[in-house]
């Protein structure tokens, strides 16, 4: 469950390390984002000479969420941290590598590029 002001880890090599959620897409009063949902983030910490800089605002998709989420088969999926992958205007990942596992829900939401770059899909 990601909401405004939530701090997240970036799971790609776009140059950002830590980001903060500033908006949840998907309706006027939508409060929470879960696995596979798009959010607007601002970069709070970045590596030098990266693609994105500190204070940049960009879209991101949630790939790991600490709050458990129920699946269709009745099982639950939960991760140790909240993590996102930064997206460009076309919805493609800005980085060329993904670090750590990603959730299977991204395949259902048609983020095939992220799923193919990820080392593990849970």
Curated annotation (Swiss-Prot):
Q: Which InterPro entries match?
A: Ribosomal_uL14, Ribosomal_uL14_bac-type, Ribosomal_uL14_CS, Ribosomal_uL14_sf
Q: Please provide the Gene Ontology terms (biological process) for this protein.
A: translation
The GO terms describing molecular function are: large ribosomal subunit rRNA binding; structural constituent of ribosome
Any keyword Nucleotide-binding? no
Query: Which family, according to UniProt?
Result: Belongs to the universal ribosomal protein uL14 family.
The entry's function note states: Binds to 23S rRNA. Forms part of two intersubunit bridges in the 70S ribosome.
Q: How is this protein named in the record?
A: Large ribosomal subunit protein uL14
The UniProt gene name for this protein comes to: rplN
